[in-house]
UniProtKB/Swiss-Prot annotation:
Known function: Binds to the 23S rRNA.
Annotated gene: rplO
Subunit comment: Part of the 50S ribosomal subunit.
Record organism: Cupriavidus pinatubonensis (strain JMP 134 / LMG 1197)
Keyword Ribonucleoprotein included in the entry's annotation: yes
Gene Ontology CC, one term: cytosolic large ribosomal subunit
Protein name: Large ribosomal subunit protein uL15
Length: 144
């Protein structure tokens, strides 16, 4: 086998359909577009979501919710992530250096996902009730 002998598998390649090239091709005259109407004309397509002048679905349904402006600046950190860290004291700077949170993050919260088996001190981070209990059960503490 050599590179110049390679061929695509049989039936895997199809010739491009040439439309408007005579009736014998099966796609002559109207080129598969039918007769008259907007879709038969050049440039004759409507924008996505247009329903022929009827009030479109995206405008019939009510607006819901909003985009939180603080979402990009807050983060969640699991006990599993903290367990992997070498540090005995964990604060926002340690999390950023470890790549667990983005540099944009201004506050983080520890959530109870995974287990903590060693003593660790959490500084300046929030924690859920379950996470607090798990940290204290492992001999650690949460300093505000």
């Amino acid at each position: 086998m050599q590179l110049n002998n390679l061929k695509p598998a049989a039936g895997s390649k199809h010739a491009k359909r040439r439309v408007g090239r005579g009736i014998g091709s099966g796609l002559g005259k109207t080129a598969g577009r039918g007769h008259k109407g907007q879709k038969s004309r050049s440039g004759g397509f409507h924008k996505v979501g247009f329903e022929g002048g009827q009030m479109p679905l995206y405008r019939r349904l009510p607006k819901r919710g909003f985009t939180s402006l603080t979402k990009a600046f807050t983060a969640e950190v699991s006990l599993r992530d903290i367990e992997r860290l070498e540090a005995a004291e964990v604060d926002l700077l340690v999390l950023k250096q470890a790549g667990l949170v983005s540099d944009l993050v201004k506050s983080a919260k520890v959530i109870k996902a995974g287990e903590l088996t060693r003593k660790v001190t959490i500084k300046g981070l929030g924690a859920t009730a379950g996470a607090k209990a798990a940290i204290e059960a492992a001999g650690g503490q949460i300093a505000e």
